[in-house]
């Protein structure tokens, strides 16, 4: 379990924590846990999420287990820098959907004495590093990688497999659209998809 750092008020610098993993791995759950601990300690906390994330609620950050905490939806990372002034702790959910400026924003906040907690997908559905997450993980003092359970093998899962043929990079969804898979299960699923597409192309060419 992650234990919060002890604040050195003489140093007057904060830090960055990143919580990453696949879908259904408990990223938002862990983010909410840390933020509520800070609220219980009477620290001033602000939470932000990208305004495109309206799956459960337009304003609340909600985990798959329905735990929730109030947030401020923002269209761009630059808004966070303005709205977070005077905070002790800043939480950011679904960080992979923000523009690249989120990295500079998080570092600016940490340099001004704020504890910054970021949660997001580390890989997209194609298995590639997702958006600004690699840079956030590189600059963070603490990185926590959480895992789901593979729906096909029961092993640890760290891939988010998309069940449909939609090729858009950003597609919000739940269990109907995605499932967490282990490396072996993901490799096999992607290979089967390629075989199906190849068969479809051959069928069309043969007509």
Indicate where each model-derived feature is located:
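Catalytic-core regions built around general acid/base machinery
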Residues: 34, 104-112, 132-139
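Conserved P-loop NTPase "ATPase switch" module shared by AAA+ and STAND
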Residues: 84-98
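Conserved AAA+ ATPase core "coupling" helix
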Residues: 141, 147-165
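Residues at the starts of beta-strands that form the adenosine-phosphate
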Residues: 44, 115, 142
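Structural recognition of the conserved hydrophobic beta-strand(s) that form the central parallel beta-sheet
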Residues: 91, 114-122
């Amino acid at each position: 379990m992650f234990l919060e750092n002890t604040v050195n008020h003489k140093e007057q610098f904060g830090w960055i924590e990143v919580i990453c993993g696949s879908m259904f791995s408990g990223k938002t759950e862990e983010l909410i846990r840390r933020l509520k601990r800070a609220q219980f300690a009477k620290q001033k906390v602000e939470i932000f999420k990208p305004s495109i994330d309206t799956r459960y609620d337009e304003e609340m950050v909600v985990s798959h287990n329905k735990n929730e905490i109030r947030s401020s939806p923002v269209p761009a990372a630059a808004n966070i820098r303005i709205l977070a002034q005077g905070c002790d702790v800043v939480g950011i959910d679904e960080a992979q959907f923000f523009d690249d400026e989120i990295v500079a924003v998080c570092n600016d906040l940490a340099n001004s004495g704020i504890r910054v907690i970021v949660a997001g997908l580390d890989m997209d559905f194609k298995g590639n590093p997702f958006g600004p997450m690699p840079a956030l993980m590189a600059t963070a003092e603490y990185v926590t990688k959480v895992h789901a359970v593979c729906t096909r093998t029961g092993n640890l899962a760290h891939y988010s497999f998309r069940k449909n043929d939609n090729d858009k990079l950003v597609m919000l969804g739940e269990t109907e659209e995605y499932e967490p898979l282990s490396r072996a299960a993901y490799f096999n699923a992607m290979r089967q998809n390629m075989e199906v597409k190849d068969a479809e192309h051959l069928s069309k060419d043969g007509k």
